[in-house]
């Protein structure tokens, strides 16, 4: 959706960004019966819109056409700027937070509800919803097979990464969006469920100002059409 000039939309919850985090929140809140609005600065694209043309895809799907960096220019940041956010343009590797990291967070920051035991069910549910599983052995390239065999010959632990895909065509251009509709993105999973339950998505709409008054929060946003 897009709003007209100077229009007002009322809702229970306004979520800024439609990537993995925003879409998950939208889905859970919509399932709970809340009114949800999702603002997305970038465009809404379908598999039919994707191609392997980097000149077209980078400015369309990435923040700063894929050239975003930290202020000191030490790190580049490949940040999705489209419906689905990074899930639309990432390479699908789905890693669980290691237990030792969760334990460190708990000991340092008191995150008692995010220990390994509690997060196991969270990871399991998310992976079911996103169809996460290991890359099949036959799907590896020759280079990958050599690397796996070499690691195992040295006695090192080596496993196929888990990915979120159905019937992956192994085109090798995941960073430009999946024209085969195999990648299980936020658009296909949590955002789709949120929209089915009445959430509203405003694409090409940038949140510019957030203010709080006595009754509620106000978000001022601007669409690409002004």
Regions of interest found by a model, annotated:
Residues 166-189:
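Cysteine-cluster motifs in flexible loop/terminal segments that predominantly coordinate metals
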Residues 1-105, 111, 116, 221:
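N-terminal glycine-rich phosphate/pyrophosphate-binding loop and immediately adjacent elements
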Residues 30, 152, 195:
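Anion (oxyanion) recognition and catalysis
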Residues 195-207:
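A conserved beta-strand/loop element that lines the FAD pocket in flavoprotein oxidoreductases
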Residues 80-170:
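Rossmann-like flavin
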Residues 209-226:
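Conserved beta-strand-loop-beta-strand element in the redox core of flavoprotein oxidoreductases
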